[in-house]
Regions:
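Phosphodiester-processing cores and adjacent nucleic acid-binding clamps
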Residues: 1-128
Length: 128
């Protein structure tokens, strides 16, 4: 079985708490060098680099899967900064659209220091 790093961040992951200054193309080049066939992008609370990542992956002939690292809280309407991290990787275009909506709601309605996801919304997602 091939190893693929599905949890990583790039230079656009989080403006407030940057994890890295590595750019998408550097990751993709290295993935190709290692013989990987898939590149995952999972930035903090956003899908900020999805178009750049897809373009670069196409250039290098590697599959691109988009995900997010989300912040789960029991009730995002409460002003409590505690949260649990979760990686969400949709496997279909339909699922990707649903994750985008989930993430939009987290940013619009659940934002308190970070875009927080409603547990109910997460549980309502299809298994795809």
């Amino acid at each position: 079985m091939e190893y693929c790093n599905y949890h990583k961040h790039d230079h656009v992951s989080s403006i407030t708490t940057p994890d890295t200054n590595i750019r998408c193309e550097e990751y993709v080049k290295r993935a190709v060098e290692l013989g990987h066939t898939t590149y995952f992008t999972t930035n903090h609370g956003n899908g900020g680099d999805i178009f750049e990542a897809k373009t670069i992956c196409d250039k290098y002939g590697i599959r691109c899967l988009f995900g997010i690292e989300g912040y789960i809280v029991p009730n995002p309407l409460e002003k409590d900064s505690r949260n649990y991290h979760i990686i969400i990787i949709p496997t279909t275009n339909k699922a990707r659209r649903k994750v985008n909506l989930l993430n939009s709601r987290a940013n619009e309605e659940g934002f308190y220091y970070k875009p927080r996801i409603f547990v109910e919304d997460l549980l309502a997602l299809d298994k795809d």
